[in-house]
UniProtKB/Swiss-Prot annotation:
Residues annotated as domain Peptidase S1: 29-267
Classification via InterPro entries: Peptidase_S1_Elastase_sf (IPR050850), Peptidase_S1_PA (IPR009003), Peptidase_S1_PA_chymotrypsin (IPR043504), Peptidase_S1A (IPR001314), Trypsin_dom (IPR001254), TRYPSIN_HIS (IPR018114), TRYPSIN_SER (IPR033116)
CDD domains given in the database record: Tryp_SPc
Location in the cell: Secreted
Entry protein name: Chymotrypsin-like elastase family member 2A
Mutation effect (D121N): In AOMS4; strongly decreased elastase activity; abolishes interaction with SERPINA1; increased levels in plasma; impaired insulin degradation; increased platelet aggregation
Disulfide bonds: C58-C74, C155-C222, C186-C202, C212-C243
Consequence of changing L85M: In AOMS4; uncertain significance; strongly decreased elastase activity; no effect on interaction with SERPINA1; no effect on insulin degradation; increased platelet aggregation
Gene giving rise to this polypeptide: CELA2A
Catalytic residues (UniProt): H73, D121, S216
Oligomer status and interactors: Interacts with CPA1. Interacts with SERPINA1.
One GO cellular component term noted in the UniProt record for this chain: keratohyalin granule
Length: 269
């Protein structure tokens, strides 16, 4: 009965996900651009407390009223976290935004911080209180289990990460258009080689635009045929040579590989 209720809830949630009140501006701007405010309403800012202040460290995606999806490498057991929702500019008070404490963190059991290229860079955060959905706070859709996007499929990475290698940290949410690089290409020796696994998804690699420091844990947003946006990736890692390095696309945890894990964690917690 509990499982039936959960599945019903997930299905009901899926009917009202990935469809922003304020649709994003989908352009081909090279180098990224400021996002339309609240056009990625599942995007969250994961923040940690230090000396009485809160600091942005990673992105994440709201996938249920009480659950946020992020990267395992964003999590440190010694830190206290909260999640900022409905945000655009992280440094001004914004109407309709929320800050909610994290009550539980579930990191994938096979994640190893010393071997990031082995994958499983995924974590779920349970919020201390479920959030009410508004025009500025909405749920992300997740793709069907096992979905593989074709080469050159257009997606958008979003976050408050650095604008370029060693560059400035933006106040407002940024978006960048990235084309998916298929596994055969991304795992070739001229690209990422054996560092990339089938449980990952690559996007970018043109030497111009990519995810960067501070984007980690955030979504790779890809539009489905029905017009809804699905989070296909979680920002995982990039090249030590720089954020925008040629033939070193951003590497994401492939969400469709972990749908069963996500549902299991939510069902049991």
């Amino acid at each position: 009965m509990i499982r039936t209720l959960l599945l019903s809830t997930l299905v009901a949630g899926a009917l009202s996900c990935g469809d922003p009140t304020y649709p994003p501006y989908v352009t081909r701007v090279v180098g990224g651009e400021e996002a339309r405010p609240n056009s990625w309403p599942w995007q969250v800012s994961l923040q940690y407390s230090s000396n009485g202040k809160w600091y942005h460290t990673c992105g994440g995606s709201l996938i249920a009223n009480s659950w946020v999806l992020t990267a395992a490498h964003c999590i440190s057991s010694s830190r206290t976290y909260r999640v900022g929702l409905g945000r655009h500019n992280l440094y001004v008070a914004e109407s309709g935004s929320l800050a909610v404490s994290v009550s539980k963190i579930v990191v994938h059991k096979d994640w190893n911080s010393n071997q990031i290229s082995k994958g499983n860079d995924i974590a779920l955060l349970k919020l201390a209180n479920p959030v009410s959905l508004t025009d500025k706070i909405q749920l992300a859709c997740l793709p069907p289990a096992g979905t593989i996007l074709p080469n050159n499929y257009p997606c958008y990475v979003t976050g408050w990460g650095r604008l370029q290698t060693n560059g400035a940290v933006p106040d407002v949410l940024q978006q960048g258009r990235l084309l998916v690089v298929d596994y055969a290409t991304c795992s070739s020796s001229a690209w990422w080689g054996s560092s990339v696994k089938t449980s990952m998804i690559c996007a970018g690699g043109d030497g111009v635009i990519s995810s960067c420091n501070g984007d980690s844990g955030g979504p790779l947003n890809c539009q489905a045929s029905d017009g809804r946006w699905q989070v296909h990736g979680i920002v995982s890692f990039g090249s030590r040579l720089g954020c925008n390095y040629y033939h070193k696309p951003s590497v994401f945890t492939r969400v469709s590989n972990y749908i069963d894990w996500i549902n299991s964690v939510i069902a049991n917690n």
